[in-house]
Regions:
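Nucleic-acid endonuclease domains
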Residues: 1-124
Length: 124
């Protein structure tokens, strides 16, 4: 399995685990800027990062959309464990309470947006 396939699979597992632990609705809620919702309909973007990377990526246009909807981020740090993952830390943060973001250009054709990196220690 390729590295990006593993990252995608691990990210999906992290989303599921956060939804279970926080009581979030995931099914049928996924968009480019929202992975789940609180039961009251408030959107949540889930950011999962493998402990070895040390950061998450946030895209400016998706962050702006989440802010417009008064949404939240669910941050997850995990490590691979067998065929799954072990969640090491998780935290919910309102989209207005992120650490200062420094936007940089990206050549990602599909995203067409600037990105910022958020180090794990800035959230935990």
């Amino acid at each position: 399995m390729s590295r990006s396939s593993n990252a995608n699979r691990y990210g999906t597992l992290a989303e599921r685990k956060l939804c279970e632990s926080r009581g979030l609705e995931r099914e049928g809620k996924h968009t480019s800027w929202c992975d789940a919702e609180f039961r009251n309909g408030t959107p949540v973007e889930i950011k999962a990062g493998m402990v070895s990377t040390g950061y998450w990526q946030v895209y400016e246009k998706y962050h702006a959309e989440l802010r417009r909807h008064d949404g939240w981020y669910g941050f997850v740090v995990y490590r691979p464990h067998g065929r799954g993952i072990k969640v090491l830390k998780e935290k919910m943060v309102h989209s207005s309470n992120l650490p200062p973001l420094s936007w940089s250009n990206t050549n990602h054709k599909e995203r067409q947006s600037r990105k910022a990196l958020i180090r794990f220690e800035e959230v935990f």
